[in-house]
Amino acid sequence: MGENTVIHPPIFTILADKVKIGKNVTILNGFQCMSAGGLVIEDNTMISLNCTIATNNHDMYDRYVITCKPVHIKRNVWIGVNVTILPGVTIGENAVVGAGAVVTKDVPDNAVVVGNPARVMRYLDSEKFVKE
């Protein structure tokens, strides 16, 4: 876990050793993570209340078979309240995931996504972000 990272309990994670968290990350309470497939959260990311990230799932026909795919959240991402992120997803740099979204596929850099399933509503101007 990187410096200046703040995690507000309670949170729940399975296989926490497969989670890598960068610097200046904030994770609010109610966070749940099934991380068998691996999870990377890069620097300057904010994860709001009651978010769920799943990196593993059960096979549709043989429920004892578990499939794992990593989730990667890139730098400077803002994830709103009650968001669910499913296995295999990469969320691009500077992206915003709106409250209640269910993210089933990759989110491009600078995109604002909302809904179930999440879809791109607009793109942010990358030149307007505060530089480190």
Task: Give the location of each predicted region.
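N-terminal segments that cap or nucleate solenoid repeat domains
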Residues: 1-9
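Short conserved AdoMet
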Residues: 2, 90, 108
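Short, conserved active-site loop motifs that form the nucleotide-linked donor/cofactor pocket
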Residues: 5, 51, 111
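Flexible, glycine/small-residue-enriched loop-and-beta-strand segment within the central core
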Residues: 8-90, 116, 122-132
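Catalytic-loop signature of eukaryotic-like protein kinases
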Residues: 76, 94, 111
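Beta-rich strand-turn-strand
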Residues: 81-105
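Acidic, glycine-centered active-site loop in nucleotide-sugar glycosyltransferases
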Residues: 108-109, 114-117
